[in-house]
Amino acid sequence: MRLSLIAVAGLAALAACSPPESEATQPADAPAALPPGRPAIYEAARVGPEEFVRALYAVHATAGGMGEPLAPGQDPIYDRMLNAMIGADFAQAAGEVPTLNHDPICDCQDSEGFSLQSVAVTQSGPTAAEAAVVFVNMGETKRLTLKLVKEGPMWKVSDVLVPGRPALTEQLMAAIS
């Protein structure tokens, strides 16, 4: 009984801290006001899953759009679990090439002539979505699926699925196990 009361009180406190839903969906134009790059990605991550995905790919169309890479396992575009796996993969590599040695968002190490062809987002709940993405990079058309989760107020990538390969989380788990 006591545990139930504590759980109810905790949920009530969380609900009281949440903004009304109408406020959360209003700033749809905010990402367009920012230049491509991390600030635009972070702002778009607060708006919705499709805006977040489009901002992720907008940086690949601009040379150096992401700026300096962040430390492995500390990138706010990935959820906590994926960041933990990326960090563990890098640490386990101990100076050698880690399993994740490319940008999983574009499945590439470099981008040239990058153009986003389509994004189709399917939201399976208030905190989960999948984005089927088609883009051209270096003359090659690629398709992949981003699994997305909402952590706090921001959408984040929780997994990357490339046809014909194991999911990114499966590859990383195999490498760090």
Residue positions per predicted region:
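Sec-dependent bacterial lipoprotein signal peptides
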Residues: 1-15
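A general "mature secreted/periplasmic domain" signal
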Residues: 150, 154-156
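Core segments of small alpha/beta cavity-forming domains
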Residues: 37-96
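Low-complexity, intrinsically disordered terminal/linker segments enriched in charged
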Residues: 124-127, 132, 138-142, 159-177
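Hydrophobic/aromatic beta-strand elements that line small-molecule binding cavities or substrate pockets
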Residues: 120, 144-150
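Juxtamembrane proline-rich low-complexity "stalk" or linker regions positioned immediately after a signal peptide
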Residues: 23-38
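Surface-exposed, charged secondary-structure patches
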Residues: 79-140
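Bacterial signal peptide processing site
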Residues: 17-20
